[in-house]
Amino acid sequence: MLRLALLVLSSMLLAILPWRPQSAFASPPKQEMAFTSPQAILGWINQYRSRPEPMRLPLAVKAMSALGVFRDLDGSGVYIGFMAGVLGANPQKADRLITAMFPMPPEDQVAVVRGIAYSGLPDWRAVLQRFSERMPARAILIKRLIDGKLPTLEKLPLDTSPAALDTLWGYYFASGRKEPVDRIIDALQWATEGNSVDKLTAGSMAKWTLANNALQRKDLLDHLKAEKRRRPKAVADQLAEVIEAAETYETSQIRKRALAAIEDLKRKGPESARKMSYWGMAGQTALALGCVVAGAMGHVEIAVPCVVGGAASSAAIKMLTPQ
């Protein structure tokens, strides 16, 4: 009888209570940034360290593949570096994260291979070997990386490709580790280079991206100040200008002076210095455009990091080429 009475009472209460859909009682779901464009992915990368979400990496990597960012070899550095940084910062989850990135088109597997090789995981060679069966089309690349015939992140040359500089930035954005930043600081020795346009461009891009990213990140600015005290005078002087530009929000002066120096060397320097590779042209284009193309074209509300690749893409170069 007691059970019957309780059932009747419950039915009466349900009848007099106003009905609401279940969703009305549920807490609102967390808003997650959708990876609908390269700019949206860059926005997520930019704020990642304030809210790390390593388990979203596979979804982001699949979006990168679908959006075609890996196929722009010079523009994909920040994405590959970021992938490597997340894997390196989460060694216990690395296998699970990589597994969830598959299936992946063979042409985009190069990015996954490099992401693993650049991760800094203590056993990255073993990890790469484990996943080699899923990437038979990349067997030669995998073997050369494992055998040490291709450089890993800490040995990538900075004066031959914009991708190397961006890859270091991507790793830093994911992990907060200072080793990639220190390599970028090393390139400041070329900021006054008088014998190679490529090296002058690389040094200028290092200086420009350091200033713009330090402007957004206090921990990075503090690290640059600490490095200034221990670096040789030539690099310390460049760091002083970077710090001043970041603290006064006057980074445009670095860009203008760099462009003028490159043009001057091309015009007046010895013939050997005037020769400019694709990297030199792409880097100069990136300086001319600033971080705008790497940022959100038409989406200024999305904060993005300052990287070279977006502005060094073929589309950006076309924008500056007379039609």
Sequence positions of predicted segments:
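Positively charged n-region of N-terminal signal peptides that target proteins for export
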Residues: 1-4
